[in-house]
């Protein structure tokens, strides 16, 4: 198999699972069991990192009107279908709908925070200190063990209007460092999963860490230009 096929496989797996951490741990398990060679595993892991961005992109759109139809479709496929394959598809669709319903609930719960002085002070500090933002994102993802969840939380915070009721309480310049910290923090799951799994499993986890760390550090060094690129 070519590296490109490995990348596409990783992308597809993460698009279905909606969890880069789970997909990466699965790949590390395959490497440890000798079912997947290290070069191919690294290609799949790189695809996983690309695929996990799809969740954030979907969250950015207003898909709340589609949540209940998606939940109903998933429920119908899971319980009405006779073939296990379609039942699995139904479970995946239902889980996907639950993901967005949870994100919507999270957004409504965060709305009152926009008027809290302590919360506003913290957001001001994060905007003024990119390093603090990176550390915040890193610690959040290490605790939650899901970059998709912390990125969803970040997107909901970024949607909240500040005291003027117009501008974001966090802003893009404040959100990007937190996002970079999320990207670094998600590697901890893979590093924990490779413990006791052999050298190749450890190497696969290290490749995952190096990929995320190098990309995040490069974006952090070029932060002003990176923000302008995103705004463009």
PLM features per residue range, with description:
Residues 103, 114-126, 169, 193-232:
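Transmembrane alpha-helical segments and their short flanking loops
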Residues 66-74, 89-98, 134, 153:
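Hydrophobic mid-bilayer segments of alpha-helices in multi-pass membrane transport proteins
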Residues 77-82, 98-112, 144, 223-227:
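Structural signal for alpha-helical transmembrane segments and their membrane-water exit/capping regions
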Residues 10, 14, 25, 39-48, ...:
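Alpha-helical transmembrane segments of multi-pass membrane proteins, especially transporters
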Residues 53, 57, 62-66, 100-105, ...:
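Mid-bilayer segments of alpha-helical transmembrane spans in multi-pass integral membrane proteins
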Residues 1, 93-139, 157, 164-168:
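Helix-loop-helix hairpins and the membrane-proximal interhelical loops
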Residues 1, 82-90, 197-207:
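Interfacial helix-loop-helix linkers and transmembrane-helix boundary segments
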Residues 14-17, 25-53, 57-66, 77-78, ...:
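Membrane-interfacial helix-loop connectors
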């Amino acid at each position: 198999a070519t590296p490109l096929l490995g990348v596409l496989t990783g992308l597809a797996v993460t698009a279905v699972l909606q969890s880069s951490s789970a997909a990466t741990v699965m790949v590390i398990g395959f490497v440890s069991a000798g079912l997947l060679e290290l070069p191919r595993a690294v290609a799949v892991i790189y695809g996983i990192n690309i695929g996990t961005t799809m969740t954030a992109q979907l969250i950015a759109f207003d898909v709340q009107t589609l949540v209940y139809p998606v939940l109903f479709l998933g429920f119908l496929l899971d319980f009405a279908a006779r073939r296990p394959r379609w039942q699995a598809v139904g479970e995946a669709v239902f889980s996907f709908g639950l993901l967005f319903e949870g994100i919507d609930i999270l957004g409504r719960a965060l709305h009152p925070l926009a008027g809290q002085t302590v919360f506003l002070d913290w957001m001001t500090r994060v905007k003024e200190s990119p390093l603090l933002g990176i550390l915040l994102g890193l610690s959040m993802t290490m605790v939650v063990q899901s970059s998709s969840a912390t990125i969803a939380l970040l997107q909901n915070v970024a949607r909240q209007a500040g005291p003027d009721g117009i501008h974001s309480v966090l802003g893009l310049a404040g959100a990007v460092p937190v996002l970079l910290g999320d990207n670094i923090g998600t590697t901890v799951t893979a590093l924990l999963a490779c413990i006791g799994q052999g050298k190749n499993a450890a190497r696969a986890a290290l490749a995952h860490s190096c990929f995320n760390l190098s990309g995040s550090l490069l974006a952090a060094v070029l932060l002003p230009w990176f923000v302008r690129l995103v705004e463009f």
